Amino acid sequence: MAYTRGTLSFSTEDGNNYSYSKSEPYTSRYLIWSGNYYFILPKSFRLSIAPGINYGHTNYSYIYQTSLQDASGILNSSREDVLQLRGSATLFKKITDRQNAFFRAWYGSTSNDVSYSGTSPYDNDFSDTYAGASLGYNFSDKMWNVSADVALQWEKNKINDLSVEEFYPLINLSAGFSPSKKHSFRTYFHFGANYPGASEKTPNVLQQNELMYYTGNPNLGLSRQVTFNLSYNWMPVNAFSASAFVQYFGEFNLYVPVFNPYNDGKALLRTFETDCDYNRTQIGMSFNYKLLNGNLQLAASPSVSLYRVSGLFDIKRSPFYCNASATYYLGNFYFQASYQTRSLTVQGNRGVIYKDRNFYQMLAGWSRSGWNIRVSAMNLFRKDWLCSTNILSTPLYSETQYVNGNNFHQRLNISVTYTLGYGKKVKRGNEVGEQYGAASAIMK
């Protein structure tokens, strides 16, 4: 359940201040099944089949009340049923000891049935259907590891009686080169596309408060994505290693929120338009150094990110980020001190600048024979509850949102786990996994 309180002060005829409260209670239930079937075939062929089904039901309410005596408030209730079917089949072929190839085909369909009642009643039927096929190749030897796959995907989005469909290519290229044990290079390139979610394409109008209404844009199309990574690793001795990297991510024709006058200029209507090019470049390094026969380990990872957003939002930011840690091992015991600076990111499809807090931690633990006992002291001198700040600025509407929580508040954690040494291999610190259902189409 999400709950928000706020106070808005402005000049009114009677001179009284204004306050509001907002709550968003919801419940979601999911049934999830997924399978993975593996077959060994003649002539060095292998076949992998992965089907899956998700069903979900969500009840969501938006309740808004004000201090005005004559105001009736806002109540929007929604019920959603979502069904997701998906499946893929991959045929692998071993050509030689150094070469492999594969052919993959996939299909998926998600349908969302959403019914709104209350202040803004409406019914919506969404469906997203996609299918595609790809060819891939891999070559590896003592120095090289090269992979490439090319795919063609068809996707169709339908909202009530309006549909949009498109064919688009997907490309993945990667290469690794290790001339010696001390040096290695790796690069990766991806070209793809992304469709907006169903909630961003909702055609109905929902009232949020006296001055704000929300709607989607059924005509939103896909955006193009480009990813490029290049890294270098250097390990002159076992006790020391360093790496340098550059990463680029670009998304073009990206949808962003747009605010327009509504209700004869007495309110604003938030919708979405394709009016953004998003570019993020990150340059960084990392270092690891072992002392005292490996019992003391020092690590640091500084980086700088270059954000450039053009279109409706003209945003330029170049934040610096670094995390560092020192870990000491004494028999079955271990101790760690770590610190990370505040991070800043620019969220392209929201036009929001996100800032969190710096974080520091002292940790002590004991591990033996599957047991892991750990005590962590975090942010011991910070008593406030502020987690992050979200800043949105447009010509007609600006918003600064302060998010509270315990992520950066002073706290003490005690963890005791025991891991059985058979069956599925799990990652320490994440012994219990979590399953997720299909994406919701409810507009919020």
Regions of interest found by a model, annotated:
Residues 1-236, 240-365, 374-444:
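Primarily recognizes Gram-negative and organellar outer-membrane beta-barrels
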